[in-house]
Protein backbone atom coordinates (compact mmCIF):
# COMPACT_ATOMS: atom_id res chain seq x y z
CA UNK A 1 0.00 0.00 0.00
CA UNK A 2 1.35 3.45 -0.96
CA UNK A 3 1.39 6.12 1.73
CA UNK A 4 -0.83 9.16 1.21
CA UNK A 5 0.28 12.73 1.85
CA UNK A 6 -1.23 12.55 5.34
CA UNK A 7 0.61 9.34 6.18
CA UNK A 8 3.91 10.67 4.80
CA UNK A 9 3.55 13.83 6.91
CA UNK A 10 2.79 11.75 10.01
CA UNK A 11 5.83 9.54 9.36
CA UNK A 12 8.04 12.62 8.98
CA UNK A 13 6.71 14.07 12.24
CA UNK A 14 7.36 10.77 14.05
CA UNK A 15 10.87 10.37 12.60
CA UNK A 16 10.12 7.17 10.69
CA UNK A 17 10.78 9.11 7.50
CA UNK A 18 13.54 11.73 7.48
CA UNK A 19 13.90 14.22 4.61
CA UNK A 20 16.44 17.03 4.89
CA UNK A 21 15.73 19.69 3.86
CA UNK A 22 11.99 19.12 4.22
CA UNK A 23 9.71 21.49 2.32
CA UNK A 24 5.95 21.10 2.94
CA UNK A 25 5.24 22.43 -0.58
CA UNK A 26 7.05 19.40 -2.05
CA UNK A 27 4.60 16.95 -0.50
CA UNK A 28 2.33 15.61 -3.23
CA UNK A 29 -0.86 13.57 -3.06
CA UNK A 30 1.06 10.33 -2.46
CA UNK A 31 4.72 11.25 -2.99
CA UNK A 32 7.42 13.75 -2.08
CA UNK A 33 9.40 15.74 -4.68
CA UNK A 34 13.20 15.67 -4.50
CA UNK A 35 15.69 17.92 -6.27
CA UNK A 36 18.95 17.59 -8.16
CA UNK A 37 22.10 18.18 -6.13
CA UNK A 38 25.00 20.26 -7.49
CA UNK A 39 27.38 17.39 -8.36
CA UNK A 40 27.56 15.23 -11.47
CA UNK A 41 30.06 12.53 -12.37
CA UNK A 42 31.04 10.37 -15.34
CA UNK A 43 33.21 7.28 -15.42
CA UNK A 44 36.77 7.89 -16.58
CA UNK A 45 37.10 4.70 -18.63
CA UNK A 46 34.99 4.10 -21.71
CA UNK A 47 34.71 0.37 -20.88
CA UNK A 48 33.80 -0.42 -17.29
CA UNK A 49 34.89 -3.54 -15.38
CA UNK A 50 32.35 -5.00 -12.94
CA UNK A 51 35.12 -6.82 -11.02
CA UNK A 52 37.13 -3.68 -10.21
CA UNK A 53 36.53 -0.15 -8.89
CA UNK A 54 35.83 2.28 -11.72
CA UNK A 55 37.10 5.83 -11.21
CA UNK A 56 34.77 8.77 -11.82
CA UNK A 57 35.33 12.37 -12.85
CA UNK A 58 33.18 14.77 -10.84
CA UNK A 59 32.05 18.29 -11.70
CA UNK A 60 30.00 20.90 -9.90
CA UNK A 61 27.28 22.34 -12.10
CA UNK A 62 27.65 26.05 -12.86
CA UNK A 63 24.77 28.52 -12.49
CA UNK A 64 24.18 28.53 -16.25
CA UNK A 65 23.45 24.81 -16.16
CA UNK A 66 25.05 21.69 -17.59
CA UNK A 67 24.25 19.99 -20.90
CA UNK A 68 23.66 16.23 -20.80
CA UNK A 69 24.21 14.43 -24.10
CA UNK A 70 22.89 11.09 -25.40
CA UNK A 71 25.14 8.06 -25.20
CA UNK A 72 26.71 9.09 -21.89
CA UNK A 73 25.94 7.79 -18.40
CA UNK A 74 25.92 10.47 -15.71
CA UNK A 75 25.85 9.89 -11.97
CA UNK A 76 23.87 12.57 -10.18
CA UNK A 77 22.71 12.90 -6.59
CA UNK A 78 19.66 14.24 -4.80
CA UNK A 79 19.82 17.48 -2.88
CA UNK A 80 17.88 15.78 -0.10
CA UNK A 81 19.25 13.39 2.52
CA UNK A 82 16.66 10.79 3.48
CA UNK A 83 16.08 8.04 6.01
CA UNK A 84 13.29 5.47 5.84
CA UNK A 85 12.35 3.32 8.84
CA UNK A 86 9.47 0.87 8.62
CA UNK A 87 8.66 1.58 4.96
CA UNK A 88 10.17 0.86 1.54
CA UNK A 89 11.03 3.97 -0.52
CA UNK A 90 10.86 4.09 -4.31
CA UNK A 91 12.38 6.90 -6.37
CA UNK A 92 10.67 7.67 -9.67
CA UNK A 93 11.18 10.43 -12.21
CA UNK A 94 8.75 13.30 -12.48
CA UNK A 95 6.52 13.50 -15.54
CA UNK A 96 7.99 16.86 -16.57
CA UNK A 97 11.49 15.38 -16.36
CA UNK A 98 10.50 12.36 -18.46
CA UNK A 99 9.02 14.64 -21.11
CA UNK A 100 12.45 16.20 -21.51
CA UNK A 101 13.80 12.74 -22.33
CA UNK A 102 15.66 12.38 -19.02
CA UNK A 103 15.89 9.00 -17.26
CA UNK A 104 16.96 9.42 -13.64
CA UNK A 105 17.81 5.78 -12.89
CA UNK A 106 18.76 2.70 -14.87
CA UNK A 107 17.40 -0.09 -12.64
CA UNK A 108 17.92 1.19 -9.10
CA UNK A 109 14.64 2.90 -8.24
CA UNK A 110 13.91 0.87 -5.10
CA UNK A 111 15.47 1.69 -1.77
CA UNK A 112 15.61 -0.59 1.26
CA UNK A 113 14.07 -0.14 4.66
CA UNK A 114 16.77 1.46 6.76
CA UNK A 115 18.47 3.25 3.85
CA UNK A 116 19.94 6.49 5.23
CA UNK A 117 21.73 8.56 2.61
CA UNK A 118 21.45 10.80 -0.41
CA UNK A 119 20.21 9.05 -3.56
CA UNK A 120 22.68 8.52 -6.39
CA UNK A 121 21.00 8.89 -9.79
CA UNK A 122 22.01 6.94 -12.92
CA UNK A 123 21.05 9.55 -15.49
CA UNK A 124 20.82 9.38 -19.28
CA UNK A 125 19.03 11.42 -21.94
CA UNK A 126 17.38 10.82 -25.31
CA UNK A 127 18.29 14.29 -26.64
CA UNK A 128 20.72 16.98 -25.39
CA UNK A 129 19.20 18.67 -22.33
CA UNK A 130 20.50 21.49 -20.13
CA UNK A 131 19.86 20.78 -16.46
CA UNK A 132 20.33 22.85 -13.31
CA UNK A 133 21.23 22.22 -9.69
CA UNK A 134 18.16 22.49 -7.49
CA UNK A 135 15.63 21.60 -10.19
CA UNK A 136 12.92 19.05 -9.29
CA UNK A 137 14.22 15.70 -10.51
CA UNK A 138 12.13 12.92 -8.97
CA UNK A 139 9.58 11.86 -6.41
CA UNK A 140 9.79 9.47 -3.48
CA UNK A 141 6.95 7.01 -2.99
CA UNK A 142 6.65 5.02 0.23
CA UNK A 143 5.21 1.52 0.59
CA UNK A 144 4.11 -0.22 3.76
CA UNK A 145 5.84 -3.49 4.66
CA UNK A 146 4.05 -6.74 5.46
CA UNK A 147 5.74 -8.65 8.26
CA UNK A 148 8.68 -8.02 10.60
CA UNK A 149 12.16 -7.14 9.32
CA UNK A 150 15.19 -8.99 10.68
CA UNK A 151 17.81 -6.51 9.49
CA UNK A 152 17.35 -3.07 8.04
CA UNK A 153 19.77 -1.77 5.43
CA UNK A 154 21.47 0.43 8.02
CA UNK A 155 22.44 -2.63 10.11
CA UNK A 156 23.58 -5.00 7.34
CA UNK A 157 27.33 -5.60 7.32
CA UNK A 158 27.16 -6.36 3.59
CA UNK A 159 25.46 -3.06 2.69
CA UNK A 160 27.73 -1.30 0.17
CA UNK A 161 26.26 2.20 0.23
CA UNK A 162 25.99 3.08 3.92
CA UNK A 163 28.72 5.74 3.93
CA UNK A 164 26.82 9.03 3.86
CA UNK A 165 27.91 11.33 1.04
CA UNK A 166 26.28 14.27 -0.81
CA UNK A 167 28.37 13.29 -3.86
CA UNK A 168 27.55 10.69 -6.54
CA UNK A 169 28.78 7.25 -5.48
CA UNK A 170 30.09 4.95 -8.26
CA UNK A 171 29.16 1.29 -8.54
CA UNK A 172 30.56 -1.00 -5.86
CA UNK A 173 29.71 -4.17 -7.71
CA UNK A 174 33.36 -5.21 -7.39
CA UNK A 175 32.79 -5.88 -3.69
CA UNK A 176 30.70 -8.90 -4.73
CA UNK A 177 33.80 -10.48 -6.30
CA UNK A 178 36.96 -11.77 -4.70
CA UNK A 179 39.91 -9.55 -5.73
CA UNK A 180 41.91 -11.18 -8.57
CA UNK A 181 45.22 -12.67 -7.40
CA UNK A 182 48.00 -10.09 -7.44
CA UNK A 183 45.64 -7.22 -8.21
CA UNK A 184 46.21 -4.09 -6.15
CA UNK A 185 42.62 -3.17 -5.50
CA UNK A 186 41.74 0.51 -5.34
CA UNK A 187 39.84 1.72 -2.33
CA UNK A 188 36.08 1.55 -3.02
CA UNK A 189 35.66 4.84 -1.15
CA UNK A 190 38.22 6.86 -3.11
CA UNK A 191 37.42 6.30 -6.76
CA UNK A 192 36.59 9.95 -7.36
CA UNK A 193 38.58 12.49 -9.31
CA UNK A 194 37.71 16.16 -9.05
CA UNK A 195 37.38 18.40 -12.08
CA UNK A 196 37.22 22.16 -12.41
CA UNK A 197 33.73 23.67 -11.94
CA UNK A 198 31.59 24.18 -15.01
CA UNK A 199 32.53 21.00 -16.82
CA UNK A 200 30.82 19.11 -19.56
CA UNK A 201 31.81 15.76 -18.08
CA UNK A 202 32.04 13.61 -21.22
CA UNK A 203 34.39 10.64 -21.30
CA UNK A 204 36.21 9.44 -24.40
CA UNK A 205 35.09 6.04 -25.67
CA UNK A 206 38.63 4.73 -25.70
CA UNK A 207 38.98 5.32 -21.98
CA UNK A 208 40.80 8.66 -22.06
CA UNK A 209 39.13 11.36 -19.99
CA UNK A 210 38.41 14.56 -21.84
CA UNK A 211 38.78 17.76 -19.86
CA UNK A 212 35.27 18.95 -18.92
CA UNK A 213 34.19 22.02 -20.89
CA UNK A 214 31.39 24.37 -19.93
CA UNK A 215 28.69 25.32 -22.39
CA UNK A 216 27.54 28.84 -21.77
CA UNK A 217 23.94 29.89 -21.56
CA UNK A 218 22.38 30.76 -24.90
Language-model features: locations:
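Cysteine-centered metal-binding/redox modules
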Residues: 215
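DUTPase catalytic domain/fold
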Residues: 1-202, 206, 218
Amino acid sequence: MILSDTRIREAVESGRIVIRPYRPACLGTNSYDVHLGPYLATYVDGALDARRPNAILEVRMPKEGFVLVPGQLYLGVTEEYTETHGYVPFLEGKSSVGRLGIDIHSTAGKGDEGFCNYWTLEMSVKVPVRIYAGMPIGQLIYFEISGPIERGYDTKASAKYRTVSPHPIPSRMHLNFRPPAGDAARSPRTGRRRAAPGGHGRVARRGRARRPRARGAR
